[in-house]
């Protein structure tokens, strides 16, 4: 076939794909608008929820510094009749509403924002500053949607408090600090989240999603988010004059050889059916062109689902670094510091299926769609690792037409990211109410 005909064919196929995506996205968006009608209280709440969202968006706070944010939410849920305990795990909140016998169901949101300068141009854009862990003053913005999550969490709390005749058991609301540093969930658990308070039977959380049309729930049973390890490596050499390399042991050359070897760990030592990522994100070494330095520092991130894959990758990194140092006759083996982050998120398959069925019954057959797993991390995993049946779901947050256009859109952690507030917020609240109502049922005798 001539090249021009092939190109025409490709363009035609691409057009069909985009038209199909647009039609599907618009169908999802129409359904998202209709689903909120099944919860009539939402319409009356919308002005207050929008005001809360804009307030939270304009006043972001960094991990473990979310004092204003926590106070705002605690005051609101306390007014709804929840028993509120503040300061759990630092700035975290636990709010309980007991409503007769039944299961304990936890709904978690995140409090913290990111050290990013917002560039959205919104009238309520953040101009906030904060102090990071190194003591540096940095701009702060909600570039990951935690402001949306908190607003939906509160809206859900308000509707559930009004609908006590529709559910039974204990609703446990958790507002967690420091998700962005992967330390908040562990801090709350260490402070007695599941011992000072009731250990839940189920735990739920939702996150905004830039790959789905606004208002559509995304789900994935089984492994959904990857574990995280940060690896800090220092390679030692023997510095000297750049014109006399024979008198030195060059750590830059050792690092270069190690980098190439490390990149084969995933491609040649890991089962292709077991997802894994090794990224070397930073290299620091040397000062000027004619001096060979004494050392080079490298920073890596390692992601995987399976703990056995994780352990093998970390062991392989050490093996390759040690081997390259020995081959170069380095004065000492590299220093390797591994900082474990979040464990992998595992969505309980049976619970996922139950929640998806409830969403499709209550909000329509297209209200929930399956989505791929991700290699990003989330410390929501800590609650599942503590023995609670847990599910993390996503909520589409991008205008369907923009998504179907094929143009590159801002992603999470971008200074340009913000969700399409409606119908995303309405759908977020509706989905959480439907799922909580599904799980909070009276025991049968």
Tell where the protein language model's regions lie, with residue ranges:
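Divalent metal-coordination and catalytic microenvironments
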Residues: 56, 95, 107, 146, ...
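Boundary at the C-terminal end of the N-terminal hydrophobic targeting segment
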Residues: 25-29
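Acidic/His- and Gly-rich active-site-bordering loop/insert found
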Residues: 30-142, 147-169
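Histidine/acidic-residue-rich, glycine-tolerant segments that coordinate divalent metal ions
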Residues: 94, 129-141, 147-148, 160-282, ...
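Bacterial N-terminal signal peptides
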Residues: 12-23
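Bacterial N-terminal signal peptides that target proteins for export
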Residues: 1-14
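Metal-dependent amide/peptide-bond hydrolase catalytic core
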Residues: 30-32, 253-445
């Amino acid at each position: 076939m001539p090249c021009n005909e092939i190109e025409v064919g490709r363009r035609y196929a691409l057009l069909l794909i985009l038209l199909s995506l647009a039609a599907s996205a618009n169908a999802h968006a129409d359904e998202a608008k209709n689903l909120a009608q099944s919860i009539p209280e939402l319409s009356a709440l919308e002005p207050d929820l929008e005001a809360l969202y804009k307030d939270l968006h304009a006043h972001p706070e960094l991990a473990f510094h979310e004092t204003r944010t926590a106070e705002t939410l605690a005051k609101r849920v306390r007014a709804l009749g929840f028993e509120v305990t503040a300061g759990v795990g630092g700035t975290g909140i636990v709010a309980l509403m007991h409503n007769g016998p039944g299961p304990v169901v936890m709904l978690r949101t995140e409090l913290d924002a990111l050290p990013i300068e917002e560039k959205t141009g919104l009238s309520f854009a953040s101009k906030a500053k904060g102090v990071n862990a190194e003591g540096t003053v940095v701009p702060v913005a909600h570039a990951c949607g935690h402001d949306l999550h908190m607003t939906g969490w509160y809206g859900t709390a308000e509707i559930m408090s009004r609908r006590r005749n529709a559910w039974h058991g204990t609703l446990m609301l958790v507002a967690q600090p420091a998700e962005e540093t992967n330390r908040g969930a562990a801090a709350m658990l260490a402070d007695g989240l599941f011992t000072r308070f009731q250990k839940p039977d189920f735990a739920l959380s939702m996150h905004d999603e830039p790959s789905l049309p606004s208002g559509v729930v995304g789900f994935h049973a089984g492994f959904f988010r990857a574990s995280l390890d940060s690896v800090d490596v220092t390679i030692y050499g023997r510095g000297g004059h750049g014109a006399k390399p024979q008198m030195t042991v060059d750590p830059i050359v050792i690092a270069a050889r190690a980098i190439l070897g490390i990149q084969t760990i995933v491609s040649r030592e890991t089962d292709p059916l077991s997802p894994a990522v090794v990224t070397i994100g930073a290299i620091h070494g040397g000062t000027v062109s004619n001096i060979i330095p004494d050392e080079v520092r490298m920073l890596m991130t390692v992601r995987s689902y399976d703990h056995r894959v994780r352990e093998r990758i970390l062991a392989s990194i050490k093996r390759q670094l040690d081997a390259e140092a020995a081959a170069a006759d380095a004065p000492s083996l590299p220093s390797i510091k591994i900082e474990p982050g979040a464990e992998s998120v595992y969505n309980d398959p049976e619970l996922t299926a139950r929640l998806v069925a409830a969403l499709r019954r209550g909000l329509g057959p297209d209200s929930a769609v399956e989505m791929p797993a991700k290699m990003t991390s989330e410390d929501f995993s800590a609650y599942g690792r503590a023995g609670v049946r847990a599910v993390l779901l996503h909520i589409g947050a991008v205008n369907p037409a923009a998504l179907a256009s094929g143009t590159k859109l801002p992603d999470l952690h971008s200074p340009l990211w913000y969700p399409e507030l409606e119908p995303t917020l309405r759908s977020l609240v509706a989905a959480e109410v439907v799922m909580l109502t599904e799980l909070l049922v009276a025991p049968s005798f």
